[in-house]
């Protein structure tokens, strides 16, 4: 119905994506908002599987965990998560790298700067 009106549709779901991946693609929405690479149980998403399912169908906003990685992570953990997200979700387009769900006041600003620096190094993907 949304597409019949010439509009795009987004869906927000930060965790629990993997078991529903095929269903989410079937829904036919255009943008997946707040894809968190870390589940509540601490397990990491298989971002390559997400990309394979979403490629050419669903754009992703997210890829960078805020509470564990940006707030508490080391420089290397932040850099690695940015690199993982861009390399897995970026090729072919469709990624807006974004902290899920926002940058909190408690987040050290240096962590944000590290994420931006890391993104600048890996943003030119094929």
Predicted regions mapped to residue ranges:
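Active-site loop segments of alpha/beta catalytic cores
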Residues: 1-126
């Amino acid at each position: 119905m949304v597409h019949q009106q010439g509009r795009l549709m987004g869906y927000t779901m930060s965790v629990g994506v993997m078991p529903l991946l095929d269903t989410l693609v079937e829904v036919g929405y255009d943008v997946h908002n707040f894809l968190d690479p870390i589940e509540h149980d601490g397990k990491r998403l298989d971002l390559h599987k997400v990309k394979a399912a979403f490629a050419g169908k669903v754009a992703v906003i997210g890829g960078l965990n805020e509470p564990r990685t940006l707030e508490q992570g080391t420089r290397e953990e932040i850099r690695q998560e940015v690199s993982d997200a861009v390399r897995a979700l970026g090729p072919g387009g469709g990624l807006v790298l974004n902290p899920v769900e926002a940058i909190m006041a408690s987040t050290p600003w240096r962590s944000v700067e590290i994420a931006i620096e890391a993104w600048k190094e890996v943003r030119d993907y094929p």
